[in-house]
């Protein structure tokens, strides 16, 4: 059977039944960590962010991480930025995370970084419900734009928090072979399906924002021996035994490596620019 046959089987299995349950916050956090361990994507994102943020020439750098999770990515980025500039600029990090346990881990990870040039805060709330009294050089949405009610509103809110010359960076999954599963099986979030890259691109470009699209980050994930929980995270739903079996067969069919379930795991990047730095007045 082809991957299309397995997708058709999944559609048939789910068509006559209630929508699959979503993931409980604790299970989401646990299985997210396990999923990331099977992919090289997070390290590639870390490298990309370090290069992007290090290119700023400002005397200090402030970052707002929307949907920061447990801080594994942001703490690694912060440590590398500080280490690469040992006598240099101050670094400010603010993480927004609705899940309290993950937010606490973000706070703990940042607190373990031994540098008096780092300051940080954590806000436990959805992005739409936050009220911040500071501005930032960079706002990041790393795999978090899926969950906002309205992409354009979130992007406009992010750009309103930018300093002159700043940018919002949205890193989002395309609707490729891997995420066809989530598109088919994941339950709605606050009345909408998860936003994939085509949705994000359309929302950003149609809302009048200044958007650049750098090259995607190409990665792979090896789900050959993935646990049931990791498969649930992969599709963003709690699978039934029957649907889980079909998911495993589908992954084997779309694998880049014969005899395994190694699947393309790319991430697209959107750079939304804030207001330009005002030019100097003529003399």
Feature locations, PLM:
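Conserved class I S-adenosyl-L-methionine
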Residues: 167-195
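Short alpha-helix
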Residues: 192-208
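Class I SAM-dependent methyltransferase Rossmann-like catalytic core
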Residues: 2-56
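A short SAM/SAH-binding and catalytic strip from SAM-dependent methyltransferases
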Residues: 137-152
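A short acidic, Gly/Pro-enriched loop at the edge of an enzyme's catalytic core
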Residues: 128-139
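A short glycine-rich, Lys/Arg-flanked "PGG" loop and its adjoining helix->strand segment in the class I
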Residues: 152-167
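Class I SAM-dependent methyltransferase SAM/SAH-binding core
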Residues: 62-129
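Conserved Class I S-adenosyl-L-methionine
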Residues: 210-283
